[in-house]
Amino acid sequence: MKAALLHQFDKSLNGPDWLSYEDVSDPVMEEPTDVIVRIGGAGVCGTDLKLIEGLWCDHMRIELPIILGHENAGWVEEIGVAVESVQVGDPVILYPTAYGDLEGSGATGSHHFRKRGFYPGFNRNGGFAEYMLAEESMLLKLPSHLSPMDTAPLADAGLTAYNVARRASKHLAPGHYTLVIGAGGLGHLCIQILRALSSTEIIVVDKSETALDLARSVGAHYTFVADEHYTEKILALTSGKGVETVIDFVGKDSSVNKGLFVTRRGGHYYLVGYGGRLTISTLEMIRSEKTVVGVLGGTFSDLKELLTMVDRGLVTLTTREYALNNANKALRDLKDGRNYGRTVLIP
């Protein structure tokens, strides 16, 4: 089969081609609950760039070469003898980790924290290929009118956006404000989910006017360019109190510092993006009683609930498609900020 492989890390992200498009052996089932999926679409994520940088090597054993791709959807091609929940030909989306306990606590709990299992695109070959080896516990059937090409990024970007919006909505009431930092692939999904789950007033900041146009089109109430003055505008809008909730999809030093600054006393700051440093005095944390929460992925139940929202038309996904053999261009465009919404590779 054809696949896009990472053979070496590039800490500076200055190399000409990060992935090699080549012929590799088809995946082979080894366990009775294994499933071979024919990939219909594989989302390209900012985390893929972090993997190429080697940023995850301190947190996970990554053996090269590896096929990246942790946002995957397609059709069941072959099933193991013990597989019961899907049949050959079923369209499916793949939860981004596998644990072999579809009916156990992993189906509802935070099983993305467990040590057992594997992570396609991280420590096992992922979906930047024509076929991928999966496990039955990862698979969720798609509604008949949703295609793998259009839904693949929901497997992680959508999952994460749903998780953080669900958690934030528990603290939101009419008249409350939520600041979303970053209106891109995750941000435009989070805006829609927040509107479906809460009555919060949504403020969005981004450095790109095009991204802010996307934010407005999916329901943002207020948008500001992420310049040196946007915190003043947010404080003016909120009568100097600040916002009840911040959801930061950027995670750089400047976004964290400014986001915490406009979080009101007793407010919640959800950190999804990463790459920067979180620095705040312990006295300030005590005095302000702010809560800072890191968010990683979501549960299998989150993915089910998100798909129900998409099926009902409450959430729509904006995508740009590339052929699999153009994976390097897709990654380069993502790095350079030329894509809005989510990027999908099509084998």
Which residues does each predicted region cover?
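Cysteine-cluster motifs in flexible loop/terminal segments that predominantly coordinate metals
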Residues: 45, 96-137
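Residue-level marker of beta-strand positions
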Residues: 71-73, 91, 131, 177, ...
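Residues in the short beta-alpha loop(s) of Rossmann-like NAD(P)-binding domains
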Residues: 208, 275, 298
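C-terminal hydrophobic helical "lid"/dimerization subdomain
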Residues: 3, 257-260, 303-347
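Glycine-rich cofactor phosphate-binding loops and adjacent beta1-alpha1 units
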Residues: 169-174, 212-291
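Rossmann-fold dehydrogenase core element
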Residues: 268-270, 280-320
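Mid-domain Rossmann-like dinucleotide-binding core that forms the NAD(H)/NADP(H) cofactor-binding site
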Residues: 137, 144-228, 232
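Glycine-rich beta-strand-centered segment in the early N-terminal region that forms part
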Residues: 25-42, 56-104, 138, 143-145
